[in-house]
Amino acid sequence: MYAVIKTGGQQFKVKQGTILKIEKLEIEPGKKVTFKEVLIVSDGDDIQVGTPFVSKVTVEAKIISQGKGKKVHILKFRRRKHSMKQQGHRQLLTEIEIVKINA
């Protein structure tokens, strides 16, 4: 059984036990979170596609940790001016484990 959930402007295909890194959620590690925006649910040959979401289906997950992603380096170089600007960014992420798909 798998489901496709929407969180943080992205879509993820999840199964029970899947570990994901998603956009930061303001929830402490160890707590549970429920995703109600489920786009697709599949149980073998039975597939339910939502318009836009499947009704009465939720996905429960447990927060494992909060952290940051890999650093992205940005370099703006101005030709013939002997000038450049260097910057970095690390996205805040939440690591979750899918506990249960309630279909």
Curated annotation (Swiss-Prot):
A cellular-component GO term for this protein: cytoplasm
Keywords, in A-Z order: Ribonucleoprotein, Ribosomal protein, RNA-binding, rRNA-binding
Any Pfam family hit: Ribosomal_L21p
Any single GO BP term: translation
Molecular-function GO terms, alphabetical: rRNA binding; structural constituent of ribosome
Family statement drawn from the similarity comment of this UniProt entry: Belongs to the bacterial ribosomal protein bL21 family.
Role, per record: This protein binds to 23S rRNA in the presence of protein L20.
HAMAP family hit by this protein: Ribosomal_bL21
Subunit structure: Part of the 50S ribosomal subunit. Contacts protein L20.
Protein name, UniProt field: Large ribosomal subunit protein bL21
Species of the source: Vesicomyosocius okutanii subsp. Calyptogena okutanii (strain HA)
Lineage: Bacteria, Pseudomonadati, Pseudomonadota, Gammaproteobacteria, Candidatus Pseudothioglobaceae
Gene from which the chain derives: rplU
